[in-house]
Swiss-Prot record:
The keyword Protein biosynthesis does not apply. It holds the Pfam family Ribosomal_L41. The gene is RPL41A. Keywords: Ribonucleoprotein, Ribosomal protein. The keyword Ribosomal protein applies. This is Small ribosomal subunit protein eS32 eS32z/eS32y/eS32x/eS32w/eS32v. It comes from Arabidopsis thaliana. One of its GO terms (molecular function) is structural constituent of ribosome.
Length: 25
């Protein structure tokens, strides 16, 4: 069960990181 929400959270974190990187550049 924990792995399921963890995978979903990881995907969201990755998307947020991409946006942050674009803002940095």
């Amino acid at each position: 069960m924990r792995a399921k929400w963890k995978k979903k959270r990881m995907r969201r974190l990755k998307r947020k990181r991409r946006k942050m990187r674009q803002r940095s550049k």
